[in-house]
Amino acid sequence: MKNTFSRLFGFGDKESEFELQDESHEEIDKKVYEEIQEIPIVNITPNRYQPRTVFDDARIDELALTIRTHGLIQPIVVRQYEDDKYEIIAGERRFRAATKLGWEKVPAIIKNLNDTETASVALIENLQREELTAIEEAVAYQKLIELHNLTQEALAQRLGKGQSTIANKLRLLKLPEEIKSALLEKSITERHARALIPLKNEELQLKVLQEIVEKQLNVKQTEERIAKLLEEAKPKRKAKQKAVSRDTRIAMNTIRQSLQMVTESGLNVNSEEEEFDEYYQITIKIPKKK
């Protein structure tokens, strides 16, 4: 059975994007599989492509307790990048738990992968666990798109997700760093963050973020607050139109009063007013003789 990475992110020609040819399958199997070895923990480094940036210490402690009781059932997966130097491909939480237990060595499977393959496996392995924050997931999608030169639609097909899911996650990356940090720290939810996107103005986004955290606003309250701000930001055209109409009335009344004063002085003045869509027209006839 072909492994998920080979099937979804193979490096063959376009006809084999989703499945590698049978001839190359055995080579891939030989390439990615080695027997389990005990590797000194001091010789192992975390994966530089690890999408997870926040590790819950309490959960690592729980995992360490489980490993102490039952042993490490699933070895970590690493690749060798220098003599006696290894990089984690999958299993960083297990590695951290083993470190907390004071282990000197940890069981590991060594796979011979290049940088692109290592990054892809690490990203996909974490995405499949569905334990990433929304921002970590978005970063993982972005890295896969860049590594394999994919469109959002192509990535969605390979991961079995809707394109809108990918697009919504990637939009989060355009938010200010403070909001992304709040998402990572789980101070706000993904829906809170997505509600902030229409504001556009970074200063306003951060102001609302502060309100969400300080007032513990739920998603509905946040959306209502943002809708109000967006409404307030709209040009007040109606008010402007009323101001223009008022000025026009003042002008018309001033002209009428002036004509009335001329008439009262004994001069017979004829005037005619016409109203059009865009303007008023006043025609005044003043006799040359009384």
UniProtKB/Swiss-Prot annotation:
Q: Which UniProt keywords apply?
A: Cell cycle, Cell division, Cytoplasm, DNA-binding, Septation
Q: Does the keyword Calcium apply?
A: no
Cell compartment(s), UniProt: Cytoplasm, Nucleoid
Q: Which residues bind DNA?
A: 153-172
Record-linked InterPro entries: Chromosome_partition/occlusion (IPR050336), HTH_ParB/Spo0J (IPR041468), Nucleoid_occlusion_protein (IPR023705), ParB/RepB/Spo0J (IPR004437), ParB/Sulfiredoxin_dom (IPR003115), ParB/Sulfiredoxin_sf (IPR036086)
> Is the keyword Iron-sulfur in the record?
no
Q: Which GO terms describe its biological process?
A: chromosome segregation; division septum assembly; positive regulation of sporulation resulting in formation of a cellular spore
Record's GO cellular component terms: chromosome; cytoplasm; nucleoid
GO molecular function term, any single one = DNA binding
Role played: Effects nucleoid occlusion by binding relatively nonspecifically to DNA and preventing the assembly of the division machinery in the vicinity of the nucleoid, especially under conditions that disturb the cell cycle. It helps to coordinate cell division and chromosome segregation by preventing the formation of the Z ring through the nucleoid, which would cause chromosome breakage.
Identify its protein family. Answer: Belongs to the ParB family.
Indicate what this protein is called per its UniProt record. Nucleoid occlusion protein
- Name its species: Bacillus cereus (strain ATCC 14579 / DSM 31 / CCUG 7414 / JCM 2152 / NBRC 15305 / NCIMB 9373 / NCTC 2599 / NRRL B-3711)
